Amino acid sequence: MAIGVIGRKCGMTRVFTEEGVSVPVTVIEVGPNRVSQVKTEESDGYQAVQVTVGERRASRVTKAQAGHFAKAGVEAGRGVWEFRAEAGEFEAGSSVTVEGFEAGQMIDVTGTSKGKGFAGGVKRWNFSTQDATHGNSLSHRAPGSIGQNQTPGRVFKGKKMAGHLGAERVTVQNLEVVRVDADKNLLLVKGAVPGATGGDVIVRLAVKAKA
């Protein structure tokens, strides 16, 4: 059973069931996740497995990174990620593949949402607009009041206002694995997953899977 894998979003398509029902799916390419380090309670204070995936030009790998990957006997990848794992479950140099998943499993997918630049409160937070007429001249899409009075005399941290929309870590839970193609290293997931085509996504077993 896979603890999780790092994949790359390829885009969306659809597959048909035997009854002819169209199912929208996201295609995730999951190359072999190479184990670059196994963290233990004794040396690191917690148990986890560190993986890398893909490749990176030698000129883009620092000496520290090169030594780290060489110690595990794996090729340098485009990044490193961690998954919590029990001791002895994995060893450095081994691989985690898409074969750890099977059709019908429920998974959680984490990615970086598409960046949409600077956005106002209506678009970013789904604020209601103000009156289009009846004396309203310039405040149709304005947020309105952002504070109270002399007390507290300030704007609270985290106040929903205009700002950068998207480009943040998002997790979609309880997506169904429709198909696993071990030959092509593909995972077909029902529905949409966060991020743009070509972006890295983290696929884990669902933490809130319904029994």
From Swiss-Prot:
Does the keyword field hold Ion transport? no
Query: Which UniProt keywords are present, listed alphabetically?
Result: Methylation, Ribonucleoprotein, Ribosomal protein, RNA-binding, rRNA-binding
Query: What segment(s) does the record annotate as region Disordered?
Result: 130-151
Q: Name one GO cellular component term.
A: cytosolic large ribosomal subunit
Q: What spans are recorded as compositionally biased (Polar residues)?
A: 130-139
Listed under GO biological process in this entry are: translation
N5-methylglutamine: which positions carry it? Answer: 150
What does the PTM comment state?
Methylated by PrmB.
Checking InterPro entries in the record gives:
Ribosomal_uL3, Ribosomal_uL3_bac/org-type, Ribosomal_uL3_CS, Transl_B-barrel_sf
User: In which domain of life is the source organism classified?
Assistant: Bacteria
Q: List, in alphabetical order, the Gene Ontology terms for molecular function in this entry.
A: rRNA binding; structural constituent of ribosome
Q: Which family does it belong to?
A: Belongs to the universal ribosomal protein uL3 family.
Quaternary structure and interacting proteins, as annotated: Part of the 50S ribosomal subunit. Forms a cluster with proteins L14 and L19.
Q: Which NCBIfam families match?
A: L3_bact (TIGR03625)
User: By its UniProt entry, which PANTHER family does this protein fall under?
Assistant: 50S RIBOSOMAL PROTEIN L3 (PTHR11229), LARGE RIBOSOMAL SUBUNIT PROTEIN UL3C (PTHR11229:SF16)
Query: What task does this protein carry out?
Result: One of the primary rRNA binding proteins, it binds directly near the 3'-end of the 23S rRNA, where it nucleates assembly of the 50S subunit.
Q: What protein name is recorded for this chain?
A: Large ribosomal subunit protein uL3
